[in-house]
């Protein structure tokens, strides 16, 4: 149960509001009792000024474009919720003009959804790299979870396949989200201690102190395995229900098979993301060849679904059973298995 509750946010029904949220994770996740959580996974717009090689909605693609109005998408979400089609919203968008303008439209949609339609269910929102920090703060107050897609496993591949993106623009919002969550956790803990009459010792740091390896073991926050490493799961001292900014944390997605990186490289990257930004999940997405481009695999290349599955298994071993990337990538993940 606790394994799943760390992935989402609990919010009870409230008088006069529509819906609730259960700490069961993201799109198409399963609860311990086997229940599938369904989210409306939708783009505000498939129009995009970026030209990422692998994307069917890239600016150079000859495809029909459609854009919801913020109010239209909010009303659609509530309508689907009332019909019991969905239990929440997973909102993303192509880049309409600029990251800031696109995020402003997403904020308008979520603000109408929360404040006018009184939707109290789960919301996951994508953050576009390059978005102004103030807008990230604003959308994080409306969404339960934020995610910034890393897209590709190396800066080289990102530069090659996504000419409008680079590693810095992707990791910068991740770092900002992490800092805001840590800051809010510190403030909530200080308020809790103050209400109990607990006074901090002089000279102590006001920041959140990441536990040392010995502290983690002593506090029982980590399982251990034959590789004798700590897991990446730092238990928050503040429940998600008390947070106002991205209470269910942040995640990211990596496309598998569009670029030449090995499973070992991908898992080492995942490890770094968990440790540096305290991500809740790294999602893996098998690349489906649908676009002819000399930078991409041939159209008849098999979709690496088994590889995606094995990476998820390895990710689980790393996060909950303390395996290192090197311990699983060779023994359990045959190189580029398809």
Which stretches of residues belong to each language-model region?
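Canonical Radical SAM [4Fe-4S] cluster-binding loop centered on the CxxxCxxC motif
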Residues: 42-71
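Conserved small/polar residues in nucleotide/adenosyl-binding loops
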Residues: 3-7, 331-338
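Conserved AdoMet/S-adenosylmethionine-binding subsite of the radical SAM
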Residues: 74, 97-316, 321
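Short Fe-S-cluster ligation motifs
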Residues: 80-92
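Hydrophobic residues within beta-strands of alpha/beta enzymes
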Residues: 55, 88-91, 146-148, 282
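Short acidic, glycine/Ser/Thr-rich loop/turn "cap" segments at secondary-structure junctions
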Residues: 57-63, 89-99, 123, 158
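Flexible, acidic/Gly-rich N-terminal and inter-domain linker regions that tether
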Residues: 1-47
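Short, charged beta->alpha transition segments
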Residues: 41-43, 71-82
């Amino acid at each position: 149960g606790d394994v799943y509750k760390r992935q989402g946010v609990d919010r009870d029904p409230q008088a006069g509001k529509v819906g609730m949220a259960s700490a069961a994770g993201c799109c198409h996740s399963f609860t311990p009792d086997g229940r599938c959580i369904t989210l409306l996974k939708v783009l505000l717009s498939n129009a995009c000024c970026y030209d990422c090689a692998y994307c069917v909605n890239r600016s150079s693609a000859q495809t029909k474009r459609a854009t919801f109005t913020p109010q239209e998408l909010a009303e659609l979400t509530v309508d689907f919720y009332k019909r019991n089609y969905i239990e929440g919203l997973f909102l993303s968008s192509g880049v309409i003009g600029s990251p800031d303008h696109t995020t402003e439209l997403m904020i308008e949609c979520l603000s109408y959804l929360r404040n006018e339609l009184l939707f109290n269910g789960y919301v996951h929102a994508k953050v576009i790299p390059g978005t102004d920090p103030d807008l990230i703060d604003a959308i994080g107050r409306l969404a339960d979870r934020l995610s910034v897609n890393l897209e590709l496993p190396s800066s080289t591949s990102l530069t090659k396949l996504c000419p409008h993106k680079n590693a810095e623009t992707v990791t910068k919002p991740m770092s900002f989200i992490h800092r805001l969550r840590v800051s809010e956790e510190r403030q909530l803990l200080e308020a809790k201690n103050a209400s109990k009459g607990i006074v901090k010792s002089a000279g102590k740091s006001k920041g959140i102190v990441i536990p040392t390896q010995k502290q983690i073991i002593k506090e029982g926050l980590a399982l251990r395995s034959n590789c004798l490493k700590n897991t990446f799961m730092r238990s928050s001292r503040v429940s998600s229900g008390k947070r106002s900014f991205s209470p269910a944390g942040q995640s990211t997605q990596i496309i598998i098979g569009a670029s030449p990186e090995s499973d070992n490289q991908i898992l080492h990257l995942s490890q770094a993301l968990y440790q540096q930004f305290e991500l809740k999940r790294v999602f893996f997405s098998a690349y489906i060849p649908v676009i002819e481009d000399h930078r991409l695999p041939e159209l008849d290349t098999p979709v690496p679904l088994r590889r995606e599955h094995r990476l998820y298994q390895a990710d689980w071993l790393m996060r909950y059973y303390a395996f290192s990337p090197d311990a699983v990538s060779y023994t359990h993940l045959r190189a580029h298995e398809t």
